[in-house]
């Protein structure tokens, strides 16, 4: 079993939340959170370089600060090549290539509601609304944020709407 240190983030128009975690290559092993999460005001940053410098400084106290990967769930439409996104209602540009250079690891960008939809099958507690049997059909994920976030999930494939 191999364990890697990863950086995950939820970057919205108001706040950016970062967490370092240990992730096993065994899918049965639950990721372990490392250190305290970091919450920063997105509006305090005009450049991702200063944002990620603060993130790296926060997690530098951990024993293993070399991230093996990073995943950023960002409020906004990700470009078709998956390498950039502008955070909605801000001027903050997130670029996976630049972020990867700053953090010395590969960075993956996804839409924040894409990430939410992908998490649905792993939810521990869910409550059905409405009657009838639960069918293995397309599921919708809706939620408030900087706007109304939406995604659909079918057969474990998520699509932001």
Model-derived regions, located:
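Short beta-strand segments
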Residues: 10, 71-75, 110, 140-147, ...
């Amino acid at each position: 079993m191999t364990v890697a240190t990863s950086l995950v983030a939820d970057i919205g128009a108001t706040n950016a939340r970062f967490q370092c975690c240990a992730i096993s290559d065994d899918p049965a092993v639950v990721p372990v959170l490392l250190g305290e999460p970091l919450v920063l005001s997105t509006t305090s940053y005009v450049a991702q370089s200063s944002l990620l410098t603060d993130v790296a400084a926060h997690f530098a106290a951990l024993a293993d600060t070399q991230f093996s990967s990073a995943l950023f769930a960002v409020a906004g439409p990700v470009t078709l090549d998956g390498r950039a996104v502008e955070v909605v209602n801000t001027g903050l540009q997130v670029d996976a290539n630049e972020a990867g250079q700053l953090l010395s690891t590969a960075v993956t960008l996804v839409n924040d509601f894409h990430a939410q939809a992908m998490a649905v099958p792993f939810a521990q507690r869910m409550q059905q609304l409405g009657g009838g049997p639960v069918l293995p059909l397309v599921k919708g994920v809706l939620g408030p944020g900087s706007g109304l976030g939406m995604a659909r999930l079918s057969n474990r494939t998520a699509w932001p709407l």
